[in-house]
Amino acid sequence: MSQSNQPDSSVTQTQAEEAVRTLLRWAGEDPTREGLLDTPRRVAEAYGDWFSGYREEPREYLERTFEEVAGYDELIVLRDISYESHCEHHMAPIIGKVHVGYLPRGKVVGISKLARVVESYARRFQVQEKMTAQIAQCIQDVLQPLGVGVVVEGAHECMTTRGIHKRGVSMVTSKMLGTFREDARTRAEFLQFIEVGGKR
């Protein structure tokens, strides 16, 4: 596991909780009142869950592959993988779906592993464009398929609950590698399978 993904071990749980108390006071609240007494602990624990991706190496999920697939060499698509992330600019939630497709080159991976890769990158502070590229590049580097396609849909609460306050807006990003980028037919087949924004 990459050590660069590890949280700063010099920051203690106590320090994290005190930081939450500081923010509560800055917002105008009294962190010692009954309703907020356990809030610092709860927030610190929630952060441990929301940002657990920093303690994982996504590539490890793809290391176990299967080659006995009766020569299957057609498109594999996993769509509607739900995710929750947080934007690195305002620490506000990003909630959406990821669609992943790849054209295998002799080996495939369990579908739950693709979902775990998505979760590992999503459970970090993110920019949607970067997360899209990270997921695609991880699959390409480890599985070395003929091509990879990743499409990410996300509703950004930094836009819906602050600033311009525009609800119902969804951002869509994509990353195409290999034959998905070079062959319009492969790309079109993938996009037809996932039908982003359309009825299924």
Curated annotation (Swiss-Prot):
Keyword Zinc tagged: yes
Organism this protein belongs to: Xanthomonas euvesicatoria pv. vesicatoria (strain 85-10)
Pathway: Cofactor biosynthesis; 7,8-dihydroneopterin triphosphate biosynthesis; 7,8-dihydroneopterin triphosphate from GTP: step 1/1
Entries under Gene3D superfamilies matching the protein: 1.10.286.10, 3.30.1130.10
SUPFAM superfamilies linked: Tetrahydrobiopterin biosynthesis enzymes-like
Any one GO molecular function term: GTP cyclohydrolase I activity
Substrates-to-products reaction catalysed: GTP + H2O = 7,8-dihydroneopterin 3'-triphosphate + formate + H(+)
InterPro entries documented for this protein: GTP-CH-I_C/QueF, GTP-CH-I_N, GTP_CycHdrlase_I, GTP_CycHdrlase_I_CS, GTP_CycHdrlase_I_dom
GO cellular component: cytoplasm
Family that this chain belongs to: Belongs to the GTP cyclohydrolase I family.
Protein name: GTP cyclohydrolase 1
Disulfide cysteine pairs (residue numbers): none
Record-listed E.C. numbers: 3.5.4.16
A GO biological-process term: tetrahydrofolate biosynthetic process
Oligomeric and partner information: Toroid-shaped homodecamer, composed of two pentamers of five dimers.
Residues the entry annotates as binding Zn(2+): C87, H90, C158
Origin superkingdom: Bacteria
Keywords for the protein's UniProt record, in alphabetical order: GTP-binding, Hydrolase, Metal-binding, Nucleotide-binding, One-carbon metabolism, Zinc
